Design a protein with these regions (language model features):
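Short acidic, hydrophobic short linear motifs in intrinsically disordered regions
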Residues: 29-43
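A short, conserved structural fragment
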Residues: 58-68
């Protein structure tokens, strides 16, 4: 049972890292400070639990979200960028940007 829980936690951590990395890379590519990006595009064909992950990352201070109907726009915070450069959910103390 604990192996299953560990596996689920690892998957959750990978999803959280994925969201932050996508935001980080989009921010770098666009050169846009505090740009807003469609979370629906980030999640396309990948995950169904958008609200769950948005809640976690917003609560942790890594991103800010804005709901417009069933569309969610998100932006990475400076704290989120720093996290991408120094750590990750799936491998603490190993930067997300060096894992992908």
């Amino acid at each position: 049972m604990s192996e299953l829980l560990d596996h689920l936690r690892n998957k959750e951590n990978e999803h959280l890292d994925h969201i932050l990395l996508e935001l980080y890379e989009r921010e770098l590519a666009s050169g846009n400070m505090q740009g807003w990006y469609s979370l629906n595009e980030i999640f396309t064909g990948q995950y169904n639990s958008q609200d769950y992950y948005v809640d976690i990352l917003s609560r942790e201070g890594y991103m800010i979200s804005s709901y417009r109907g069933n569309h969610i726009e998100v932006t990475i915070t400076s704290y989120g960028k720093q996290f991408c450069e120094t750590s990750s959910y799936s491998q603490p103390n190993v930067p997300i940007i060096k894992q992908m």
